[in-house]
Amino acid sequence: MTTKQNIKRYSRKELEELMQSIGEPRFRAAQLHRWLYSDRASDFHEMTTISKSLRETLDRKYFLPQCSMSSTQCVEDSSADSTTRKFLVQLHDQEAVETVLIPAEGRNTVCVSTQVGCPLHCSFCATGYMGFTRNLNAAEIAEQVFLVQDYLDAIGCGAVTNIVYMGMGEPLLALEEVIESVGILSDTTYRLHISQKKITLSTVGLLPEIGMLARSGLTTNLAISLHSADQETRASLMPSARDYPLKELRKTLIQYTSETGQPVTLVYMLLKEINDTQEDALKLVRLARSFLCKINLIDYNPIVNIKFDSAGEQRKNIFIRTLVDAGLNVTVRKSHGSSINAACGQLAINKKLPESSTL
């Protein structure tokens, strides 16, 4: 007996090729894609705009996997100033990822995961200590947003307005699937469509993939997990920086901003006595003056058995003042969901964290 294939593994282009290979007109692919990602059919026989014979062929050869989550897999932040919610999203192969809803300032932002685990092992990030299992496909990325929208509909709290690819994993290691998922989520003819201007992709700074992203035609925002403008310090925090040093990252970001005309966001987590001195701030000033950018400062979010501390208010204020006095565009991002391990760097599923880790 032939094993059924996952129809959601096919990109939009691959669906066109599939339809042509079985003698169907090319437009059938568009109909099928709409049923999958706008109407969100759970069975081929629901696809009434497609001929019965094609529905039967698809049902015989393919299956329609569904991601899922339940109310019991939702954790709410109980702090007075946050309504962040963290969801456990079950994938069809029994793997799972965490997805976060951040309602704030009139927006509903969804933070999506792109990998089960992460292979990059950033020292301040819980996900890296999970190890790495696999990339998500485009459907699994998009369905995280669909499921959160279902949740918002159920509680009467509006629509998803923004998406950040800042959950579990390194998005640019799954670049093809990420690009395909952005296409699904931003299709203006679909039921749920988010402007690409309200979608942000994050990366530790994978240089070849940043170049590919610049040429992809997407108009999404790009955030760089920087965390230090000193090469030695950055490499000690983020092993990937050894392969992609700051000197080369700077050149790539100059080219990226020149090609796209869009600023990048430099994300900088302030860590006590590691990257929070005035000298560190001045190094960041010199780097940031090289290309069009804005700087997003964030506090360290505690992780069990990882011995970092947040910079104190005095050191943080001196750091901020140094950047502002240099004329840089600086925002201080409020962490949402730290009390439920849903903030930046805290996402991890049922994996043992290290007994002790420090720089």
UniProtKB/Swiss-Prot annotation:
Its cofactor is [4Fe-4S] cluster. GO terms for biological process: rRNA base methylation; tRNA methylation. CDD domains: Radical_SAM. [4Fe-4S] cluster binds at C118, C122, C125. Reaction proceeds by a ping-pong mechanism involving intermediate methylation of a conserved cysteine residue. Belongs to the radical SAM superfamily. RlmN family. This is Probable dual-specificity RNA methyltransferase RlmN. It comes from Prosthecochloris aestuarii (strain DSM 271 / SK 413). The gene is rlmN.
